[in-house]
Amino acid sequence: AIYLGNEYPSVINSINIGNETLVFWSDHRVPVDTLSSYLKYVKNNVSLPVTTADDFNAWNREENKKIADLVDFIVLHVHPLWAGLQIEGSVDWTRKIYNEIKDIHKDKLIVIGETGWATQKHNQGLQAKLIKGKTGEVEQEQFILGFKKWADTKNIPYFLFEVFDENWKGGDHPNEVEKHWGLFKADRTPKLYMKNYKSHYEQN
C-alpha cells in the first residue's frame, strides 16, 4: 500500500488500513494499540490521507477514540438491514446513525464506506434472527433511491455496498445473505436499480 500510494498519487486518493477490526462482533478484531501502530507507520511513509473502515458500533465507542483521532477521515459502515430495520424506516435510521457519529467526531470528514440492501436472505441462522426487513430487488432499489436523495443533498461521500454479488461469501446455501448485496448479479447482469438507472438519472 505504501509503495503504490507513493508511486501513483494521482490515481490513489487515500489508503485504508483494516476493515471492521474494532467492532465487537468482528471475527478478526485487532487491539487498538496494534491498529494505531499500523496507521502511524503508514501515515509516516505516505503523503496521502490514511484511514480505517469500521461499523458504526466501533466509531461510537470511547475506547476507539484514539483511532478516530488518528485517522484523516472516518469510513463508516451502516447497514439498516442488519440492524433489523424494515425498508420503510431504513433511510431515516441511516441518517440518524450518520448524524450520531458526526456529532461524536465533529471535526472529521465522514465517508459512508458501506451501505446497501440485500436482494436475498436465508431463513436460517443468525441472519434469520437479525434481519427483519424484506429482501429483494424492489426493496434494494427503494433503499438506494431514498439513501442517494438524502446523501447527495447533504454532499455526503459514500460507497454503495456493493457492485457485484459475491457467490463465495457466507455459508453454502445459495440464499445466504452475504452473497446478495450487489447491484449486479455475479454473472454481471443488472438488478432492478441498475436496469432503471438511466430513467432515475433523467428524472433527477
Write out the residue ranges for each language-model feature:
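Extracytoplasmic/secreted cell-surface and envelope-processing proteins
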Residues: 23-28, 32, 59-62, 83-86, ...
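Surface-exposed amphipathic alpha-helices with a cationic face
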Residues: 2, 31, 35-47, 51, ...
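Catalytic-core region of carbohydrate-active enzymes that cleave or remodel glycosidic bonds
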Residues: 94-112, 125-156
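Active-site groove signature of glycoside hydrolases
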Residues: 2-30, 62, 112
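Distinct, well-ordered alpha-helical segments
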Residues: 1-5, 28-33, 38, 55-71
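Aromatic-rich peripheral "rim/lid" segments of glycoside hydrolase catalytic domains that contact
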Residues: 123, 127-137, 150-204
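Aromatic- and acid-rich polysaccharide-binding/catalytic face
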Residues: 12-19, 54-96, 117-118
